[in-house]
Amino acid sequence: MKSHYIVLALASLTFLLCLPVSQSCNKALCASDVSKCLIQELCQCRPGEGNCPCCKECMLCLGALWDECCDCVGMCNPRNYSDTPPTSKSTVEELHEPIPSLFRALTEGDTQLNWNIVSFPVAEELSHHENLVSFLETVNQLHHQNVSVPSNNVHAPFPSDKERMCTVVYFDDCMSIHQCKISCESMGASKYRWFHNACCECIGPECIDYGSKTVKCMNCMF
């Protein structure tokens, strides 16, 4: 039985690696979950005329990644990713129990660790924030915490003597979205952004939105 699963795992990995570049699925985003679903034999069928016995199980297995990864298992039409490179797309999430003091301590001064620390004005972060609703929800939370924020212009800087800075951390190497979340949690980050080329960005407590939309992972740029 164990050898059976090993064979299935190797087969699913080979399947993903052999997809043509022009029509391949987003391997960085999908490989882990697609392999899991293929090993469980939940995505083995193909849609036919009025008959797809495994489609529902496959969709449930892929979960939130269905839209991005259904072409990897032959359930929807292949996409051409040349028009939208993985570095231009990302997944973001708030972490439930951030530790601001830990994050600040780990990002102060120069470090010899495998990451890159980047700081920039909060106003710059807000100038390209991608979701106004998310921002307004954050502003509402900050009001309850008695933090002063601009009330009439989302692009305005914070009214303080020293402009507030947003600090983020980019890990040098590529990693899965699961590992990105764990790594950011372990350093006390408030949020994380996982680019679809597998670059991981941990976002500090001073940031209002979701940090920077620019990939800056040293060994994971494309």
Swiss-Prot record:
Name recorded for this polypeptide: Twisted gastrulation protein homolog 1
Domains as described in the record: The N-terminal domain is sufficient to interact with BMP4.
UniProt keywords, alphabetically: Developmental protein, Glycoprotein, Secreted, Signal
Biological-process GO terms, alphabetical: BMP signaling pathway; camera-type eye development; chondrocyte differentiation; forebrain development; hemopoiesis; mesoderm formation; negative regulation of BMP signaling pathway; negative regulation of CD4-positive, alpha-beta T cell proliferation
Signal peptide per UniProt: 1-24
Inactivation phenotype: Embryonic lethality and sirenomelia were observed only in BMP null embryos in which one or two copies of TSG were also missing. When TSG and BMP7 are mutated, the siren phenotype results from the fusion of the limb buds in the ventroposterior midline owing to a paucity of posterior ventral mesoderm.
Positions of glycan attachment: 80, 146
Disulfide partners: none
Family the UniProt entry places it in: Belongs to the twisted gastrulation protein family.
Gene Ontology terms, MF aspect: heparin binding; transforming growth factor beta binding
Pfam families listed in its UniProt record: Tsg (PF04668), Tsg_N (PF23782)
A GO CC annotation given for this chain: extracellular space
Subcellular location: Secreted
Role, per record: May be involved in dorsoventral axis formation. Seems to antagonize BMP signaling by forming ternary complexes with CHRD and BMPs, thereby preventing BMPs from binding to their receptors. In addition to the anti-BMP function, also has pro-BMP activity, partly mediated by cleavage and degradation of CHRD, which releases BMPs from ternary complexes. May be an important modulator of BMP-regulated cartilage development and chondrocyte differentiation. May play a role in thymocyte development.
Tissue specificity annotation: Expressed in lymph node, liver, kidney, and lung. Expression in the kidney was stronger in the medulla than in the cortex, particularly in the cells surrounding the medullary tubules. Expressed in growth plate cartilage of long bones, ribs, and digits and to a lesser extent also in the resting zone of the epiphysis, trabecular bone, and vertebral cartilage. Expression seems to be absent from other skeletal tissues including muscle, skin, and fibroblasts.
